[in-house]
Amino acid sequence: MVTIRADEISKIIRERIEQYNTEVKIVNTGTVLQVGDGIARIYGLDEVMAGELVEFEEGTIGIALNLESKNVGVVLMGDGLMIQEGSSVKATGRIAQIPVSEAYLGRVINALAKPIDGRGEISASESRLIESPAPGIISRRSVYEPLQTGLIAIDSMIPIGRGQRELIIGDRQTGKTAVATDTILNQQGQNVICVYVAIGQKASSVAQVVNTLQERGAMEYTIVVAETADSPATLQYLAPYTGAALAEYFMYRERHTLIIYDDLSKQAQAYRQMSLLLRRPPGREAYPGDVFYLHSRLLERAAKLSSQLGEGSMTALPIVETQSGDVSAYIPTNVISITDGQIFLSADLFNAGIRPAINVGISVSRVGSAAQIKAMKQVAGKLKLELAQFAELEAFAQFSSDLDKATQNQLARGQRLRELLKQSQSAPLTVEEQIITIYTGTNGYLDSLEIGQVRKFLVELRAYLNTNKPQFKEIISSTKTFTGEAEVLLKEAIQEQMELFLLQEQVEKN
Protein backbone atom coordinates (compact mmCIF):
# COMPACT_ATOMS: atom_id res chain seq x y z
CA MET A 1 0.00 0.00 0.00
CA VAL A 2 1.32 3.44 -1.08
CA THR A 3 1.78 5.83 1.81
CA ILE A 4 1.04 9.50 1.06
CA ARG A 5 3.45 11.80 2.81
CA ALA A 6 1.95 15.21 3.51
CA ASP A 7 5.31 17.01 3.59
CA GLU A 8 6.20 15.82 0.05
CA ILE A 9 2.86 16.95 -1.33
CA SER A 10 3.11 20.34 0.36
CA LYS A 11 6.68 20.73 -1.02
CA ILE A 12 5.49 20.00 -4.58
CA ILE A 13 2.56 22.41 -4.21
CA ARG A 14 4.87 25.10 -2.82
CA GLU A 15 7.29 24.67 -5.79
CA ARG A 16 4.42 24.88 -8.27
CA ILE A 17 3.12 28.06 -6.62
CA GLU A 18 6.59 29.62 -6.74
CA GLN A 19 6.94 28.74 -10.45
CA TYR A 20 3.52 30.17 -11.33
CA ASN A 21 3.85 33.32 -13.39
CA THR A 22 0.87 35.65 -13.51
CA GLU A 23 1.38 37.09 -17.00
CA VAL A 24 -1.74 38.72 -18.39
CA LYS A 25 -1.68 39.20 -22.18
CA ILE A 26 -4.37 41.28 -23.83
CA VAL A 27 -4.78 40.62 -27.56
CA ASN A 28 -6.87 42.97 -29.67
CA THR A 29 -8.94 40.64 -31.87
CA GLY A 30 -11.83 40.86 -34.30
CA THR A 31 -13.98 38.73 -36.59
CA VAL A 32 -14.14 38.77 -40.40
CA LEU A 33 -17.59 39.98 -41.53
CA GLN A 34 -16.93 39.85 -45.27
CA VAL A 35 -13.94 39.46 -47.58
CA GLY A 36 -13.39 39.92 -51.31
CA ASP A 37 -11.63 42.07 -53.97
CA GLY A 38 -8.61 42.47 -51.67
CA ILE A 39 -10.72 44.10 -48.92
CA ALA A 40 -11.90 42.62 -45.60
CA ARG A 41 -14.47 44.10 -43.21
CA ILE A 42 -13.69 43.27 -39.58
CA TYR A 43 -15.98 43.50 -36.55
CA GLY A 44 -14.08 44.21 -33.33
CA LEU A 45 -10.43 45.38 -33.32
CA ASP A 46 -11.62 48.26 -31.10
CA GLU A 47 -8.20 49.75 -30.37
CA VAL A 48 -6.58 49.36 -33.78
CA MET A 49 -4.50 52.30 -35.15
CA ALA A 50 -4.87 53.76 -38.64
CA GLY A 51 -2.31 52.02 -40.85
CA GLU A 52 -1.68 49.24 -38.29
CA LEU A 53 -0.84 45.76 -39.55
CA VAL A 54 -3.38 43.04 -38.73
CA GLU A 55 -2.87 39.28 -39.02
CA PHE A 56 -5.52 36.85 -40.21
CA GLU A 57 -5.90 33.30 -38.89
CA GLU A 58 -4.31 31.73 -42.00
CA GLY A 59 -1.29 34.07 -42.01
CA THR A 60 -2.27 36.84 -44.47
CA ILE A 61 -1.27 40.35 -43.38
CA GLY A 62 -3.49 43.39 -43.95
CA ILE A 63 -3.44 47.14 -43.25
CA ALA A 64 -6.29 48.80 -41.33
CA LEU A 65 -7.21 51.84 -43.45
CA ASN A 66 -10.85 52.59 -42.67
CA LEU A 67 -11.75 52.94 -38.99
CA GLU A 68 -15.56 53.14 -38.89
CA SER A 69 -18.03 53.08 -35.99
CA LYS A 70 -19.22 49.52 -36.54
CA ASN A 71 -16.32 47.87 -38.39
CA VAL A 72 -12.76 48.24 -39.70
CA GLY A 73 -11.90 48.23 -43.43
CA VAL A 74 -8.68 46.29 -44.04
CA VAL A 75 -6.74 46.05 -47.34
CA LEU A 76 -4.99 42.72 -47.86
CA MET A 77 -1.32 42.25 -48.77
CA GLY A 78 -2.03 39.12 -50.76
CA ASP A 79 -4.90 37.40 -52.54
CA GLY A 80 -6.68 36.43 -49.29
CA LEU A 81 -8.29 33.39 -50.92
CA MET A 82 -7.95 31.29 -47.74
CA ILE A 83 -9.61 33.86 -45.44
CA GLN A 84 -13.06 32.74 -44.30
CA GLU A 85 -16.01 34.72 -43.01
CA GLY A 86 -16.18 34.42 -39.23
CA SER A 87 -12.46 33.67 -38.82
CA SER A 88 -10.52 35.69 -36.25
CA VAL A 89 -8.10 38.57 -36.86
CA LYS A 90 -5.57 40.00 -34.42
CA ALA A 91 -3.94 43.42 -34.32
CA THR A 92 -0.13 43.26 -34.30
CA GLY A 93 0.50 46.68 -32.71
CA ARG A 94 2.99 47.47 -35.52
CA ILE A 95 2.91 49.98 -38.37
CA ALA A 96 4.24 48.70 -41.74
CA GLN A 97 8.04 48.59 -41.75
CA ILE A 98 10.77 46.91 -43.80
CA PRO A 99 14.30 45.66 -43.08
CA VAL A 100 17.07 47.85 -44.56
CA SER A 101 20.79 47.25 -45.18
CA GLU A 102 23.63 47.59 -47.70
CA ALA A 103 22.91 43.97 -48.74
CA TYR A 104 19.90 45.16 -50.77
CA LEU A 105 22.21 46.66 -53.43
CA GLY A 106 22.05 44.67 -56.66
CA ARG A 107 18.82 42.90 -55.70
CA VAL A 108 15.25 42.82 -57.04
CA ILE A 109 12.64 42.93 -54.25
CA ASN A 110 8.89 43.36 -53.82
CA ALA A 111 6.96 45.98 -51.82
CA LEU A 112 7.49 44.00 -48.59
CA ALA A 113 11.28 44.03 -49.20
CA LYS A 114 11.31 40.27 -49.89
CA PRO A 115 13.72 39.18 -52.66
CA ILE A 116 12.09 38.03 -55.93
CA ASP A 117 15.26 37.42 -57.96
CA GLY A 118 15.83 33.86 -56.72
CA ARG A 119 19.21 34.68 -55.14
CA GLY A 120 18.36 33.82 -51.54
CA GLU A 121 17.47 35.82 -48.46
CA ILE A 122 18.85 39.30 -47.69
CA SER A 123 20.42 39.82 -44.27
CA ALA A 124 19.45 43.02 -42.46
CA SER A 125 19.83 44.10 -38.85
CA GLU A 126 17.96 47.42 -39.03
CA SER A 127 14.42 48.31 -40.07
CA ARG A 128 12.64 51.51 -41.19
CA LEU A 129 9.00 52.52 -41.26
CA ILE A 130 7.60 52.44 -44.80
CA GLU A 131 5.89 55.78 -44.10
CA SER A 132 8.17 58.21 -42.28
CA PRO A 133 7.93 62.00 -42.00
CA ALA A 134 9.77 64.16 -44.55
CA PRO A 135 12.73 66.28 -43.34
CA GLY A 136 11.65 69.72 -42.07
CA ILE A 137 12.88 73.10 -43.33
CA ILE A 138 15.74 73.30 -40.78
CA SER A 139 16.93 69.80 -41.77
CA ARG A 140 17.39 70.82 -45.42
CA ARG A 141 19.68 73.02 -47.45
CA SER A 142 19.11 74.37 -50.95
CA VAL A 143 20.10 72.27 -53.95
CA TYR A 144 23.61 73.14 -55.16
CA GLU A 145 25.30 69.97 -56.54
CA PRO A 146 24.48 68.69 -60.03
CA LEU A 147 23.06 65.24 -60.73
CA GLN A 148 24.14 64.50 -64.30
CA THR A 149 21.75 62.45 -66.44
CA GLY A 150 24.13 62.00 -69.38
CA LEU A 151 21.50 63.45 -71.74
CA ILE A 152 22.57 66.71 -73.41
CA ALA A 153 19.05 68.18 -73.61
CA ILE A 154 18.49 67.74 -69.85
CA ASP A 155 21.94 68.59 -68.45
CA SER A 156 22.24 71.76 -70.57
CA MET A 157 18.70 73.20 -70.50
CA ILE A 158 16.74 71.44 -67.72
CA PRO A 159 19.51 70.71 -65.17
CA ILE A 160 18.77 68.53 -62.15
CA GLY A 161 20.42 69.00 -58.76
CA ARG A 162 20.93 66.49 -55.95
CA GLY A 163 17.88 66.60 -53.70
CA GLN A 164 15.54 67.87 -56.42
CA ARG A 165 12.22 66.34 -57.55
CA GLU A 166 11.94 66.44 -61.35
CA LEU A 167 8.87 64.96 -63.04
CA ILE A 168 9.21 62.99 -66.29
CA ILE A 169 5.86 63.28 -68.05
CA GLY A 170 4.58 62.11 -71.44
CA ASP A 171 2.33 59.73 -73.33
CA ARG A 172 2.89 55.98 -73.42
CA GLN A 173 5.80 54.83 -75.59
CA THR A 174 7.63 58.18 -75.63
CA GLY A 175 10.79 56.98 -73.85
CA LYS A 176 10.09 57.98 -70.22
CA THR A 177 11.65 54.81 -68.77
CA ALA A 178 14.60 55.18 -71.17
CA VAL A 179 15.40 58.66 -69.76
CA ALA A 180 15.25 57.23 -66.22
CA THR A 181 17.43 54.17 -66.95
CA ASP A 182 19.99 56.30 -68.83
CA THR A 183 20.23 58.49 -65.72
CA ILE A 184 20.94 55.37 -63.60
CA LEU A 185 23.63 54.23 -66.08
CA ASN A 186 25.25 57.68 -65.91
CA GLN A 187 25.67 57.44 -62.09
CA GLN A 188 28.42 54.83 -62.54
CA GLY A 189 31.46 55.97 -60.57
CA GLN A 190 29.57 58.98 -59.15
CA ASN A 191 28.99 57.35 -55.71
CA VAL A 192 25.18 57.56 -56.07
CA ILE A 193 22.85 54.75 -54.89
CA CYS A 194 19.91 54.25 -57.29
CA VAL A 195 16.47 52.81 -56.48
CA TYR A 196 14.17 51.94 -59.39
CA VAL A 197 10.53 51.36 -58.37
CA ALA A 198 8.36 49.61 -60.99
CA ILE A 199 4.65 49.99 -60.21
CA GLY A 200 2.10 48.00 -62.19
CA GLN A 201 4.50 47.42 -65.11
CA LYS A 202 4.58 44.33 -67.30
CA ALA A 203 6.98 41.74 -65.83
CA SER A 204 8.75 41.60 -69.23
CA SER A 205 9.42 45.38 -69.13
CA VAL A 206 10.91 45.15 -65.62
CA ALA A 207 13.06 42.18 -66.71
CA GLN A 208 14.31 44.23 -69.68
CA VAL A 209 15.33 47.14 -67.42
CA VAL A 210 17.08 44.79 -64.95
CA ASN A 211 18.85 43.09 -67.86
CA THR A 212 20.13 46.44 -69.23
CA LEU A 213 21.40 47.47 -65.77
CA GLN A 214 23.14 44.10 -65.27
CA GLU A 215 24.83 44.17 -68.69
CA ARG A 216 26.23 47.65 -68.01
CA GLY A 217 27.33 46.86 -64.44
CA ALA A 218 24.82 49.31 -62.95
CA MET A 219 23.09 46.78 -60.68
CA GLU A 220 26.07 47.03 -58.28
CA TYR A 221 24.71 50.36 -57.00
CA THR A 222 20.99 49.84 -57.77
CA ILE A 223 18.00 48.32 -55.95
CA VAL A 224 14.91 47.40 -58.00
CA VAL A 225 11.54 47.37 -56.20
CA ALA A 226 9.00 45.68 -58.47
CA GLU A 227 5.27 45.13 -58.12
CA THR A 228 4.04 44.04 -61.54
CA ALA A 229 0.57 44.42 -63.07
CA ASP A 230 -0.67 41.14 -61.54
CA SER A 231 0.18 42.21 -57.95
CA PRO A 232 -2.61 43.15 -55.52
CA ALA A 233 -3.51 46.87 -55.54
CA THR A 234 -2.30 47.18 -51.91
CA LEU A 235 1.25 46.18 -52.86
CA GLN A 236 1.27 48.46 -55.93
CA TYR A 237 0.22 51.31 -53.61
CA LEU A 238 2.97 50.46 -51.08
CA ALA A 239 5.88 49.92 -53.52
CA PRO A 240 6.92 53.62 -53.85
CA TYR A 241 6.99 54.05 -50.06
CA THR A 242 9.18 50.94 -49.74
CA GLY A 243 11.60 52.39 -52.32
CA ALA A 244 11.63 55.73 -50.48
CA ALA A 245 12.39 54.00 -47.14
CA LEU A 246 15.39 52.21 -48.71
CA ALA A 247 16.67 55.45 -50.30
CA GLU A 248 16.22 57.31 -46.98
CA TYR A 249 18.32 54.68 -45.20
CA PHE A 250 21.29 55.64 -47.42
CA MET A 251 20.47 59.38 -47.39
CA TYR A 252 20.66 59.54 -43.58
CA ARG A 253 24.01 57.72 -43.77
CA GLU A 254 25.50 60.69 -45.65
CA ARG A 255 25.13 59.08 -49.10
CA HIS A 256 23.60 60.42 -52.32
CA THR A 257 20.60 58.54 -53.69
CA LEU A 258 18.46 58.70 -56.82
CA ILE A 259 14.95 57.21 -56.80
CA ILE A 260 12.75 56.64 -59.84
CA TYR A 261 9.01 55.95 -59.51
CA ASP A 262 7.81 54.28 -62.71
CA ASP A 263 5.02 55.31 -62.71
CA LEU A 264 2.86 57.25 -60.24
CA SER A 265 -0.25 57.11 -62.49
CA LYS A 266 -0.41 53.36 -61.83
CA GLN A 267 0.00 53.91 -58.07
CA ALA A 268 -2.87 56.44 -58.12
CA GLN A 269 -5.04 53.91 -60.00
CA ALA A 270 -4.26 51.20 -57.43
CA TYR A 271 -5.12 53.63 -54.62
CA ARG A 272 -8.35 54.60 -56.39
CA GLN A 273 -9.31 50.92 -56.64
CA MET A 274 -8.66 50.38 -52.91
CA SER A 275 -10.56 53.53 -51.93
CA LEU A 276 -13.63 52.75 -54.02
CA LEU A 277 -13.77 49.20 -52.63
CA LEU A 278 -13.50 50.66 -49.12
CA ARG A 279 -16.52 52.82 -50.07
CA ARG A 280 -14.70 56.12 -49.62
CA PRO A 281 -16.48 58.95 -51.51
CA PRO A 282 -15.06 59.46 -55.03
CA GLY A 283 -13.89 62.89 -56.25
CA ARG A 284 -12.58 64.15 -59.59
CA GLU A 285 -11.99 61.31 -62.13
CA ALA A 286 -13.27 58.97 -59.34
CA TYR A 287 -10.01 59.44 -57.38
CA PRO A 288 -10.44 59.82 -53.59
CA GLY A 289 -10.10 63.23 -51.97
CA ASP A 290 -6.64 62.51 -50.51
CA VAL A 291 -4.91 61.45 -53.75
CA PHE A 292 -2.85 64.69 -53.66
CA TYR A 293 -1.58 63.75 -50.19
CA LEU A 294 -0.75 60.26 -51.51
CA HIS A 295 1.90 61.78 -53.80
CA SER A 296 2.92 64.86 -51.77
CA ARG A 297 3.92 62.86 -48.68
CA LEU A 298 5.96 60.55 -50.94
CA LEU A 299 7.78 63.23 -52.95
CA GLU A 300 8.43 65.53 -49.97
CA ARG A 301 10.74 62.82 -48.61
CA ALA A 302 13.26 63.71 -51.34
CA ALA A 303 15.66 66.29 -49.92
CA LYS A 304 19.16 67.68 -49.72
CA LEU A 305 20.05 67.37 -46.03
CA SER A 306 21.82 70.11 -44.07
CA SER A 307 25.49 69.90 -43.10
CA GLN A 308 24.48 68.98 -39.50
CA LEU A 309 22.75 65.85 -40.86
CA GLY A 310 25.67 64.93 -43.12
CA GLU A 311 24.62 66.48 -46.45
CA GLY A 312 23.12 63.26 -47.82
CA SER A 313 20.58 63.64 -50.61
CA MET A 314 17.64 61.89 -52.22
CA THR A 315 16.76 62.97 -55.76
CA ALA A 316 13.37 61.83 -57.03
CA LEU A 317 12.42 61.34 -60.69
CA PRO A 318 8.71 60.47 -60.64
CA ILE A 319 7.18 59.39 -63.96
CA VAL A 320 3.57 60.19 -64.91
CA GLU A 321 1.79 58.96 -68.02
CA THR A 322 -0.53 61.34 -69.88
CA GLN A 323 -3.40 60.45 -72.22
CA SER A 324 -2.80 61.99 -75.69
CA GLY A 325 -0.67 64.81 -74.26
CA ASP A 326 -3.27 66.07 -71.76
CA VAL A 327 -1.15 67.67 -69.03
CA SER A 328 -4.23 69.25 -67.42
CA ALA A 329 -5.65 65.93 -66.16
CA TYR A 330 -5.92 65.41 -62.38
CA ILE A 331 -2.82 63.34 -61.54
CA PRO A 332 -0.43 65.21 -63.92
CA THR A 333 -1.44 68.64 -62.51
CA ASN A 334 -1.10 67.34 -58.94
CA VAL A 335 2.41 65.97 -59.46
CA ILE A 336 3.53 69.01 -61.51
CA SER A 337 2.55 71.25 -58.56
CA ILE A 338 4.46 69.06 -56.07
CA THR A 339 7.71 68.71 -58.05
CA ASP A 340 10.51 71.22 -58.78
CA GLY A 341 10.04 71.09 -62.55
CA GLN A 342 9.12 68.70 -65.33
CA ILE A 343 10.65 67.08 -68.40
CA PHE A 344 7.92 66.83 -71.02
CA LEU A 345 8.29 64.06 -73.61
CA SER A 346 6.29 64.55 -76.81
CA ALA A 347 4.85 61.74 -78.97
CA ASP A 348 5.12 63.97 -82.09
CA LEU A 349 8.86 64.54 -81.54
CA PHE A 350 9.36 60.83 -80.82
CA ASN A 351 7.61 59.85 -84.06
CA ALA A 352 9.64 62.45 -85.97
CA GLY A 353 12.82 60.61 -84.89
CA ILE A 354 13.96 63.20 -82.31
CA ARG A 355 15.01 61.02 -79.38
CA PRO A 356 15.09 61.64 -76.46
CA ALA A 357 11.78 63.31 -77.41
CA ILE A 358 12.12 66.20 -74.95
CA ASN A 359 9.97 69.25 -75.64
CA VAL A 360 12.43 71.88 -74.46
CA GLY A 361 9.89 74.71 -74.76
CA ILE A 362 7.56 73.54 -71.98
CA SER A 363 10.07 71.58 -69.90
CA VAL A 364 11.49 73.45 -66.93
CA SER A 365 13.75 72.97 -63.90
CA ARG A 366 12.86 75.35 -61.09
CA VAL A 367 15.90 74.87 -58.83
CA GLY A 368 18.41 73.00 -61.00
CA SER A 369 20.20 76.03 -62.49
CA ALA A 370 21.83 76.63 -59.08
CA ALA A 371 23.39 73.17 -59.36
CA GLN A 372 24.68 73.45 -62.94
CA ILE A 373 28.48 73.62 -63.24
CA LYS A 374 29.89 76.95 -64.47
CA ALA A 375 31.38 75.43 -67.63
CA MET A 376 27.96 74.19 -68.76
CA LYS A 377 26.34 77.57 -67.96
CA GLN A 378 28.99 79.34 -70.07
CA VAL A 379 28.48 77.09 -73.08
CA ALA A 380 24.76 76.32 -72.95
CA GLY A 381 23.48 79.75 -71.90
CA LYS A 382 22.09 80.68 -75.31
CA LEU A 383 21.14 77.17 -76.46
CA LYS A 384 17.57 77.21 -75.10
CA LEU A 385 16.89 80.67 -76.57
CA GLU A 386 18.26 79.70 -80.00
CA LEU A 387 16.15 76.53 -80.06
CA ALA A 388 13.01 78.44 -79.02
CA GLN A 389 13.60 81.04 -81.77
CA PHE A 390 14.22 78.24 -84.28
CA ALA A 391 10.94 76.49 -83.36
CA GLU A 392 9.07 79.78 -83.90
CA LEU A 393 10.84 80.45 -87.22
CA GLU A 394 10.27 76.90 -88.44
CA ALA A 395 6.52 77.21 -87.88
CA PHE A 396 6.53 80.58 -89.68
CA ALA A 397 8.73 79.33 -92.56
CA GLN A 398 6.12 76.74 -93.56
CA PHE A 399 3.93 79.57 -94.89
CA SER A 400 6.67 81.50 -96.66
CA SER A 401 8.62 80.47 -99.76
CA ASP A 402 11.25 83.22 -100.17
CA LEU A 403 13.26 83.74 -96.98
CA ASP A 404 16.16 86.17 -96.58
CA LYS A 405 19.70 84.87 -96.05
CA ALA A 406 19.78 85.58 -92.28
CA THR A 407 16.56 83.61 -91.73
CA GLN A 408 17.86 80.71 -93.84
CA ASN A 409 21.07 80.67 -91.78
CA GLN A 410 19.11 80.70 -88.52
CA LEU A 411 16.95 77.79 -89.72
CA ALA A 412 20.05 75.84 -90.80
CA ARG A 413 21.70 76.46 -87.40
CA GLY A 414 18.53 75.39 -85.56
CA GLN A 415 18.30 72.12 -87.50
CA ARG A 416 21.89 71.29 -86.58
CA LEU A 417 21.35 72.18 -82.92
CA ARG A 418 18.32 69.90 -82.85
CA GLU A 419 20.47 67.18 -84.41
CA LEU A 420 23.17 67.44 -81.72
CA LEU A 421 20.55 66.90 -78.99
CA LYS A 422 19.71 63.45 -80.41
CA GLN A 423 21.21 60.53 -78.51
CA SER A 424 21.01 56.76 -78.72
CA GLN A 425 19.45 54.89 -75.80
CA SER A 426 21.86 53.68 -73.08
CA ALA A 427 24.62 55.97 -74.37
CA PRO A 428 24.96 58.74 -71.75
CA LEU A 429 27.68 61.36 -72.28
CA THR A 430 29.99 62.88 -69.66
CA VAL A 431 29.76 66.63 -68.92
CA GLU A 432 33.01 67.23 -70.82
CA GLU A 433 31.64 65.46 -73.91
CA GLN A 434 28.41 67.46 -73.67
CA ILE A 435 30.36 70.74 -73.51
CA ILE A 436 32.33 69.74 -76.64
CA THR A 437 29.08 68.93 -78.47
CA ILE A 438 27.18 72.11 -77.49
CA TYR A 439 30.12 74.48 -78.13
CA THR A 440 30.64 73.04 -81.60
CA GLY A 441 26.96 73.58 -82.47
CA THR A 442 26.32 77.01 -80.94
CA ASN A 443 29.48 78.53 -82.45
CA GLY A 444 28.55 77.59 -86.00
CA TYR A 445 31.17 74.90 -86.65
CA LEU A 446 28.48 72.48 -87.84
CA ASP A 447 26.85 74.93 -90.28
CA SER A 448 29.06 73.81 -93.18
CA LEU A 449 28.12 70.12 -92.73
CA GLU A 450 25.07 68.33 -94.09
CA ILE A 451 22.49 67.47 -91.39
CA GLY A 452 23.15 63.75 -91.96
CA GLN A 453 26.88 64.23 -91.21
CA VAL A 454 26.45 66.07 -87.88
CA ARG A 455 26.21 63.08 -85.52
CA LYS A 456 29.05 61.19 -87.22
CA PHE A 457 31.32 64.26 -86.98
CA LEU A 458 30.50 64.83 -83.29
CA VAL A 459 31.24 61.19 -82.38
CA GLU A 460 34.62 61.42 -84.14
CA LEU A 461 35.38 64.83 -82.57
CA ARG A 462 34.73 63.53 -79.04
CA ALA A 463 36.98 60.51 -79.68
CA TYR A 464 39.70 62.78 -81.18
CA LEU A 465 39.72 65.06 -78.12
CA ASN A 466 39.87 62.08 -75.74
CA THR A 467 42.95 60.64 -77.42
CA ASN A 468 44.82 63.73 -78.70
CA LYS A 469 43.93 66.45 -76.17
CA PRO A 470 43.24 64.72 -72.80
CA GLN A 471 44.18 67.93 -70.95
CA PHE A 472 40.85 69.47 -72.11
CA LYS A 473 38.89 67.03 -69.94
CA GLU A 474 41.30 67.55 -67.05
CA ILE A 475 40.77 71.35 -67.12
CA ILE A 476 36.95 71.04 -67.12
CA SER A 477 36.82 68.35 -64.40
CA SER A 478 39.29 70.13 -62.09
CA THR A 479 38.18 73.80 -62.49
CA LYS A 480 34.49 73.17 -63.44
CA THR A 481 34.83 76.22 -65.73
CA PHE A 482 35.30 76.62 -69.48
CA THR A 483 38.62 78.49 -69.34
CA GLY A 484 40.35 80.32 -72.20
CA GLU A 485 42.92 77.50 -72.35
CA ALA A 486 40.13 74.90 -72.71
CA GLU A 487 38.52 76.97 -75.49
CA VAL A 488 41.81 77.19 -77.42
CA LEU A 489 42.28 73.40 -77.16
CA LEU A 490 38.70 72.78 -78.31
CA LYS A 491 38.96 75.18 -81.28
CA GLU A 492 42.21 73.51 -82.41
CA ALA A 493 40.62 70.06 -82.13
CA ILE A 494 37.51 71.13 -84.09
CA GLN A 495 39.62 72.57 -86.94
CA GLU A 496 41.94 69.54 -87.08
CA GLN A 497 39.05 67.07 -86.96
CA MET A 498 37.02 69.06 -89.55
CA GLU A 499 39.90 68.86 -92.05
CA LEU A 500 40.24 65.10 -91.44
CA PHE A 501 36.48 64.59 -91.68
CA LEU A 502 36.06 66.49 -94.96
CA LEU A 503 39.03 64.58 -96.45
CA GLN A 504 37.44 61.25 -95.44
CA GLU A 505 34.09 62.29 -96.92
CA GLN A 506 35.79 63.27 -100.20
CA VAL A 507 37.65 59.96 -100.36
CA GLU A 508 34.42 58.05 -99.72
CA LYS A 509 32.63 59.98 -102.49
CA ASN A 510 35.40 59.25 -104.99
From Swiss-Prot:
E.C. number(s) listed in UniProt: 7.1.2.2
DNA-binding keyword on record: no
GO BP of this protein: proton motive force-driven ATP synthesis
Keyword Mitochondrion applies: no
Cited Gene3D superfamilies: 2.40.30.20, ATP synthase alpha/beta chain, C-terminal domain (1.20.150.20), P-loop containing nucleotide triphosphate hydrolases (3.40.50.300)
Residues the record marks as site: Required for activity: S363
Topology term for the membrane: Peripheral membrane protein
Binding site for ATP: G170, D171, R172, Q173, T174, G175, K176, T177
Catalysis performed (reactions): ATP + H2O + 4 H(+)(in) = ADP + phosphate + 5 H(+)(out)
Protein location: Plastid, Chloroplast thylakoid membrane
Principal location: plastid
Enzyme class: translocase
Pfam families found in the cross-reference section: ATP-synt_ab, ATP-synt_ab_C, ATP-synt_ab_N
Subunit structure, as described in the record: F-type ATPases have 2 components, CF(1) - the catalytic core - and CF(0) - the membrane proton channel. CF(1) has five subunits: alpha(3), beta(3), gamma(1), delta(1), epsilon(1). CF(0) has four main subunits: a, b, b' and c.
Function: Produces ATP from ADP in the presence of a proton gradient across the membrane. The alpha chain is a regulatory subunit.
UniProt xrefs under HAMAP family: ATP_synth_alpha_bact
Family note: Belongs to the ATPase alpha/beta chains family.
Protein name per UniProt: ATP synthase subunit alpha, chloroplastic
Designated gene of the protein: atpA
